[in-house]
From Swiss-Prot:
GO terms for molecular function: sequence-specific DNA binding. One of its GO terms (biological process) is DNA-templated transcription. This is Protein DOG1-like 2. Pfam families: DOG1. InterPro entries: Seed_Dev/Stress_Resp_Reg, TGA_domain. Disruption phenotype: No germination phenotype. Residues 10-246 form the DOG1 domain.
Amino acid sequence: MERSSSYGVEKLQKRCYHEWMSLQTKHIDDLKEALMCQRNNDDKLEDLVGKIVNDYHTYAGKRSELSYRCCAHYFAPSWNTPIENSMLWMGGCRPSSFIRLIYALCGSQAETQLSQYLLKIDDDFDINHGGFMSDLTATQLGKLNDLHLEVIKKEDKITKTSANFQDDVADLPIADVVHADVAVEDALDKHEEGMAVLLAEADKLRFETLRKIVDVVTPLQAVEFLLAGKRLQLSLHDRGRVRADVCGGVGGAAV
């Protein structure tokens, strides 16, 4: 792909990311309001959760479409901070981290401060108990544990396939790489096409994991989970920008 074409695609990908981040901020406001005003209205909570999950599905679809035009940018995005890029798995977070966040919200003493921070709604309204996730039943926990194991297995499969793609490129003769042989370009094109497929699979796994989680938990627990996840993501991005400034780097603009 020509440099100008690749740059144009990257601009579209970056715009897609910033639009998603703006929507994330709106989601947080909506989730806060739901916890303050609608916590006893399951229908309203379900509608909000469904909308947010659908918004993520739409975003993942846009990412997939753009990745087939040039997927390499998603594996070290210029719009991310360096610390965020160091934590990426297949262009995003590990789906299994969604479930680990739930475990952190369940109320163990080791995670109490984190839970209280992530669930803080505003300066005048806090959830001071362990959070609604602390009310998870044994049946819910069992289903989440089964999902966790299933997701880890699928993550490992995607990771292994990615490693195989890298090995295929590494096996190219060094002389061919130096002289930019046509076979090398074909191999790199094949590599990027394969990685675009894997990125789509990873995004699908992220979406399916999110959807299955909200099916297991109550509407109120789903709102709590989504709020904590989005606050954690934004906090990591902000912290990454601070660290980038201290190190003299350039952090991405605010997901």
